[in-house]
Amino acid sequence: MLCWGYWSLGQPGISTNLQGIVAEPQVCGFISDRSVKEVACGGNHSVFLLEDGEVYTCGLNTKGQLGHEREGNKPEQIGALADQHIVHVACGESHSLALSDRGQLFSWGAGSDGQLGLMTTEDSVAVPRLIQKLNQQTILQVSCGNWHCLALAADGQFFTWGKNSHGQLGLGKEFPSQASPQRVRSLEGIPLAQVAAGGAHSFALSLSGAVFGWGMNNAGQLGLSDEEDRESPCHVKLLRTQKVVYISCGEEHTAVLTKSGGVFTFGAGSCGQLGHDSMNDEVNPRRVLELMGSEVTQIACGRQHTLAFVPSSGLIYAFGCGARGQLGTGHTCNVKCPSPVKGYWAAHSGQLSATADRFKYHIVKQIFSGGDQTFVLCSKYENSSPAVDFRIMNQAHYTSLINDETIAAWKQKLSEHNNANTINGVVQILSSAACWNGSFLEKKIDEHFKTSPKIPGIDLNSTRVLFEKLMNSQHSVILEQILNSFESCLIPQLSSSPPDVEAMRIYLILPEFPLLQDSKYYITLTIPLAMAILRLDTNPSKVLDNWWSQVCPKYFKKLVNLYKDAVVYLLQGRKTFLIPVLFNSYITAALKLLEKLYKVNLKVKHVEYDAFYIPEISSLVDIQEDYLMWFLHQAGTKARPSVIQDAVTLCSYPFIFDAQAKTKMLQTDAELQMQVAVNGANLQNVFMLLTLEPLLARSPFLVLHVRRNNLVGDALRELSIHSDIDLKKPLKVIFDGEEAVDAGGVTKEFFLLLLKELLNPIYGMFTYYQDSKLLWFSDTESSRTFRLPWGRY
């Protein structure tokens, strides 16, 4: 292991070195015969994690940040952690964290701002203590700022604690510093890949490359195009399309690594730590042009300097503040552009010349930096191993995914230890929208990195395959847990305002769950899902509409049929509902979701319009009564308010009516309109009699006077002189010169004679189509013909 930079008590592991500044890489004599896994650097202390899980520390110990009583440059083991197998360590300015293989988190050091998460603000804690509030969580990843901490749990929950002077906890303005871990709800549902803390700012990275920043922004270190602090996570939109896979934070600057090996930096640049050949701050992410010809696989930020590793050449590039030797260039001056760290470096896959002294060369495995210090894990040329690639995400470190491997592991655990703790651990994952949202990413040509309001970025086929496997009887225990999780936790807790489009994939995933198609679960799964979708705010609701527009017709049709079946089920069982309000809310949810799907289908034509028809409507619902209720509601009548106000009328959703139901509805409408017209005429006649103006009385019938030898012309003439209201009245026909009273027979004869003339090919109004054997209006007719009064009748 090599190291360089500044140590107030001397370089770690070298007792004779009392000089604080080490300006070029030197071998760190610490535990030469044991393998170091990870190094974390604080303000003036260092933490070393060994492959066997032991933890060693050295440096200043003014606040107990070393976890033992000794102070100096010789690393000493933390005895209090000897019984734990530690897998990850992190440092703040004067405090430290250690994560065990069981997901438990320990803290020690300075605690005056609550940064230890121990529910106290003790000035110093010299012995590592378990953070009790996170004991029910399986923590996968931690990161420390100067005086605050971030932690990511297996179920996607994200916790912060410590100082909140600039909003770095992401909890909002109303929250002061926190002495115990607090859940950041504003990122719920997003499958997080990484959390990273700077001096007083914080970042979270999603599996699909969405970057969220908050906290101090005095130099633009959040990349949000301004210098205003943020108290809640904000999406760094300028990085959305860059496929970001890793983030490293300095005290007031930030560096991000993309999947293609590019590096973007932003924030404070007063020492050149952004690598843009200037000392200016940057409020927007800007690519480091000097590194564009190289594929970077590792980045690390110190307080005011930045490192980048290029495996093809084996070189480490450094830029920024060099006053304390932290760049490793052999000088103590600032550097504005990436410059190679001094030393003999070689690529793991490269070949050295025959004359080269192979024992001098180092092969980099991993770089670490923090404060004013840098450490490099490396090996000799002869027995080197490939360097760690930060672009390849380690599944053990990010939000848990639900796939064949995890299901097999759960099945084994439940068979061996079917206790409350095991079940709770499984339920936590299954109840997490974040875990589901990250589980079926479309990885073909990195499609999930394109996730947007128009592209969901998931592979629904893999979702379907997994659910089909779970329906196998051998997975009955897991299936039961999924069902319980969906019913009691996941669906009821879905947010009406998801923080990002990545949090919305769950709305496409859940309909693939086969038990939603089972009528036994309509009330507990299918209808609650519809309610959750309908609760969505305007913008996320539009996003879901866009995604539905993109799905395959088979998926869309299955969704339509699901809620058609739910409507039929509810109508068949409406009498069994003890509380009518519940029935009304359930069927309204199903109908409104169908309406939402219908509107989407109008734009994209996934299915034919008759796919929304529910043929059972005619037999399950009194169409005439339903239409009357709808009519009264539309008219705003005050009659029977308790019934009308809460009643659900299917006529509000005419797209579900087939021809039979629509015919009945139109007949009811015609009869109703006719009765309204007759009543109106009768009421006016009564008024005229009372005002002694009987001559102005109106007939309650529409009376047509026609001649048999000019039937069509007379009918059109008569219709043209009547108002729309008159046209809704019952019809009576009088043939000129005939004394017969029209009791219905004359009207029938009138229509028979009229249609006979209209359908005559010589007349030319209709055309007969041989293929369908149907009649329709002739193409030669102008649009004016269809607007004649006769057409309205």
Task: Show the residue positions of the predicted features.
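Short glycine/serine- and acidic-residue-enriched loop/turn motifs that recur at repeat junctions
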Residues: 2-22, 49, 56, 60-74, ...
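Alpha-helical catalytic/interaction cores of small GTPase-regulatory modules
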Residues: 774-792
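Conserved core positions of repeat-based scaffolds
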Residues: 3, 45-48, 57, 95-98, ...
